[in-house]
Amino acid sequence: MPRGTAQRGGLLAHLDRPKSRSRLRVREPRRLPRGLDRAETAALLGSFRSDRDRAIAGLMLFSGLRSAEVLALQVRDVDIPRRWVRVVGKGDKERTVPLDVDVAGLVQTYLLAERPESASTALFLVAKGSHRGQPLTPAGLRTVFRYHRAVAGVPAGHPHALRHSFGTALAEAGVDLAVLQALMGHDRVDSSAAYIHLAPTHVRASYDAARARQRADV
């Protein structure tokens, strides 16, 4: 047997076999969240008529709450005088977030004048109909936003769009990534970092500031 043939049967045998495809999976780029622009936000917020719905939208837009987090709020979770909200997020993880002063006023007015009398301790209740006084459900919240998207002419006006607008606004304001992660309730820092990509003006400002410091050190 020729020497070359013997070698191919041993160390070089792989040259005669078709290469199998690599089983490594390439991670697909993370889809960046879509927030609302100023006009869309104003139109959507302007369509709400009840203090309950305004407060719900405000908690999403100015405190970054998810739909499920809003619906899980209990009356005791909202500290209006100190303007804090206790939030139970994914995996039953708790965080405390600031309460915008205007949203605090909406919640207070809702509690005093609009919230139905009920044995339920849930913050947001059904306002009318046969389920009046019962906790607002995910289906009920979807109905509210579906109606107001149509009224406002803002097809992208979903609850998560308000939350994403909150995250984007923080990134544009230059909020520290760790603070952004804490406010948004993200388990992974890369989830928060996605908002930095949505704020190119902040990225450019940070870059220019860093370059200015470098030039000053030369």
Give the ranges of each region predicted by the language model.
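Conserved catalytic core of the tyrosine transesterase superfamily
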Residues: 1-218
